[in-house]
């Protein structure tokens, strides 16, 4: 895709702080981090959402996260946990699927805030999902 910023980064046309790269995936530092060490895992092949992603990327990227990236973040940044997120279309400016790796630290204030009003609809949503 010609105008995709992530595709340009993958091709080396734009700079990035690359942490890891192989033939399937490129991992870069987020330029808008939620916490220190916030990384983005990008498939090298352009795709818009998780439904477009090849299974090879999914299995490979989670292996890289488990075996390489999470241990690196724990060792170098002393994070206590890791939040993985894919927020397609929810505030996402770049239409190229990616996985956010957000290192978690005590008192990092990066908590997900739930909506207690949604509890009223829990049974209705459960029913819809299990029909």
Q: Where do the model's predicted regions map?
A:
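HIT superfamily nucleotide-processing domains
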Residues: 1-131
């Amino acid at each position: 895709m010609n105008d995709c910023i992530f595709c340009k980064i993958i091709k080396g046309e734009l700079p990035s702080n690359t942490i890891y790269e192989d033939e399937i995936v490129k991992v870069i530092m987020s330029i808008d981090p939620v916490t220190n060490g916030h990384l983005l895992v990008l498939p090298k092949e352009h795709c818009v959402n998780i439904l477009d992603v090849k299974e090879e990327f999914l299995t490979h990227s989670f292996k890289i996260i488990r075996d390489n990236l999470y241990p690196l973040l724990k060792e170098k940044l002393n994070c206590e946990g890791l939040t993985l997120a894919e927020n397609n279309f929810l505030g996402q400016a770049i239409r190229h699927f990616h996985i956010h790796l957000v290192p978690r630290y005590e008192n990092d204030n990066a908590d997900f805030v739930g909506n207690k009003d949604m509890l009223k609809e829990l049974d209705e949503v459960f029913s819809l999902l299990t029909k």
